[in-house]
Amino acid sequence: MACGFRRAIACQLSRVLNLPPENLITSISAVPISQKEEVADFQLSVDSLLEKDNDHSRPDIQVQAKRLAEKLRCDTVVSEISTGQRTVNFKINRELLTKTVLQQVIEDGSKYGLKSELFSGLPQKKIVVEFSSPNVAKKFHVGHLRSTIIGNFIANLKEALGHQVIRINYLGDWGMQFGLLGTGFQLFGYEEKLQSNPLQHLFEVYVQVNKEAADDKSVAKAAQEFFQRLELGDVQALSLWQKFRDLSIEEYIRVYKRLGVYFDEYSGESFYREKSQEVLKLLESKGLLLKTIKGTAVVDLSGNGDPSSICTVMRSDGTSLYATRDLAAAIDRMDKYNFDTMIYVTDKGQKKHFQQVFQMLKIMGYDWAERCQHVPFGVVQGMKTRRGDVTFLEDVLNEIQLRMLQNMASIKTTKELKNPQETAERVGLAALIIQDFKGLLLSDYKFSWDRVFQSRGDTGVFLQYTHARLHSLEETFGCGYLNDFNTACLQEPQSVSILQHLLRFDEVLYKSSQDFQPRHIVSYLLTLSHLAAVAHKTLQIKDSPPEVAGARLHLFKAVRSVLANGMKLLGITPVCRM
């Protein structure tokens, strides 16, 4: 993309360098606004054209850049060519820049930036994304919330790029906790409470039975026996377990809907209780399964007894473990979906677990293990509601809504809203997501409610405010002015800065699609919003001549469109009034 300008520059370079234009596309980039000391719109990195060896000293590259620039000519697209630090710089014809960018944004709509030449030639893939994955009856902690919003972003971006994406929620719905839960429900459970608030009641039962099991060995033994009955397929035990699972999923779906998140498949460890036994047999048949003195079964991934490379795959009573069920799930998904890539989104504490799972798949003879990828993220500290620690996702959403409603009530400029609760939740979620996505996903960060809800500065509230403000401009002036426009009316520095920034959207999407880091898009949208705020003050529409007003309105409409596109990719629903 960059509206075809990048390709036009690549075509001219290809004639001089005798290289196909396709080989040059990724070496040509739009110049970020913050670096615009000069007037260039695009730059060619001379380093990226040369072989990366030590023979190319800095002066040589600078000389080559100068020689290359001298061989190039200005044309109807490029109005000026110059050299920078190891770069050749290109300035685009101003009227052409204005007309082409604005036309492209309006014509491409939600696809702006995604039809870029940066993405052409990339094969369409089938991608499985496993994310969120809470444990039934345990706390839906902040790690699950991070997994949910990060996984949703990755799935959104891959889908927008035309890939077939399968979103899987792999629930922790099996294991020893269900022995405790089954026993606990028989002791302390109430059917009415289970039906009215399943997640809350199961959690209360789970906490209570854990306390009892710690003090009373007979309760711990009963829990162990209940789980063994589950593993052996006891009808009564399975019926109770199924009820817990079904009611929990109904509740999850309702809460995920508030987040704007959905899944194509609600899977879980329980699906693989039988298939995990097949995995154990396969490991044994390949001579990879080793029995320990304690009666457990392990796989030695080092081959030389290194304790750090030992992975336990079976308990002494023959029941399966998390790793075994993950192996069975991966094999089943390949059979079912024949995926090109499978992405697991979990906290960085599971890094070793996934390394071992992928390694075991490989030594079992599954070459496609290389298509599996773990996207780890850091820990969030200090997220508490007013009632204390976060227990369930719904607590977070309710807290967001409450705090945002209070904020909106205290601001004089808040508009009369048809549904203030919905607006508050959408703005609050934007605030939460932007705070989370601003840094590297792998970084830990300290959560602050006060910082999240600041309306000024680099926050989600600021993005939503900018979108609502631009939408209000269109509502107020749109009918009279949104016809044809004169590009000569958008030559002020504020207009040009916005147009230059809009040029870069495809590069930002490309970067995020390569490293799965949403911060590139977040940074881009925040800069766009700051540029729009400056332009809104200086580029008046009211009382301007119709030709000027129309051109400016087109510019602001393009900004709002790209802002909305980027926000939706991040998992944010833009608001039109606030």
Curated annotation (Swiss-Prot):
Residues at which L-arginine binds: 133-135, 144, 322, 326, 350
Annotated localization: Mitochondrion membrane
Known catalytic reactions: tRNA(Arg) + L-arginine + ATP = L-arginyl-tRNA(Arg) + AMP + diphosphate
Effect on the protein upon substituting residue 241 to R: No effect on mitochondrial membrane localization
GO molecular function, a single term: RNA binding
Keyword terms, alphabetized: Acetylation, Aminoacyl-tRNA synthetase, ATP-binding, Disease variant, Ligase, Membrane, Mitochondrion, Neurodegeneration, Nucleotide-binding, Pontocerebellar hypoplasia, Protein biosynthesis, Transit peptide
A GO term from the CC aspect: mitochondrial matrix
Motif annotated as 'HIGH' region, chain positions: 133-144
GO biological process, one term: arginyl-tRNA aminoacylation
Major location category of this protein: mitochondrion
N6-acetyllysine sites (modified residues): 568
Impact after mutating residue 436 to Y: Found in a patient with complex IV deficiency and non-lethal infantile mitochondrial disease; uncertain significance
Annotated consequence of substituting residue 342 to V: No effect on mitochondrial membrane localization
Effect of residue 404 to K: No effect on mitochondrial membrane localization
PROSITE patterns noted in UniProt: AA_TRNA_LIGASE_I (PS00178)
Protein EC: 6.1.1.19
EC class of the enzyme, as a word: ligase
Keyword Mitochondrion: yes
InterPro entries named among the record's database cross-references: aa-tRNA-synth_I_CS, Arg-tRNA-ligase, Arg-tRNA-synth_N_sf, ArgRS_core, DALR_anticod-bd, Rossmann-like_a/b/a_fold, tRNAsynth_Ia_anticodon-bd
Residue interval of the organelle targeting sequence: 1-16
Primary role: Catalyzes the attachment of arginine to tRNA(Arg) in a two-step reaction: arginine is first activated by ATP to form Arg-AMP and then transferred to the acceptor end of tRNA(Arg).
Disease affiliated with this protein: Pontocerebellar hypoplasia 6: A disorder characterized by an abnormally small cerebellum and brainstem, infantile encephalopathy, generalized hypotonia, lethargy and poor feeding. Recurrent apnea, intractable seizures occur early in the course of this condition.
PANTHER family per UniProt: ARGININE--TRNA LIGASE, MITOCHONDRIAL-RELATED, ARGINYL-TRNA SYNTHETASE
Family classification: Belongs to the class-I aminoacyl-tRNA synthetase family.
Name listed for the protein in its UniProt record: Probable arginine--tRNA ligase, mitochondrial
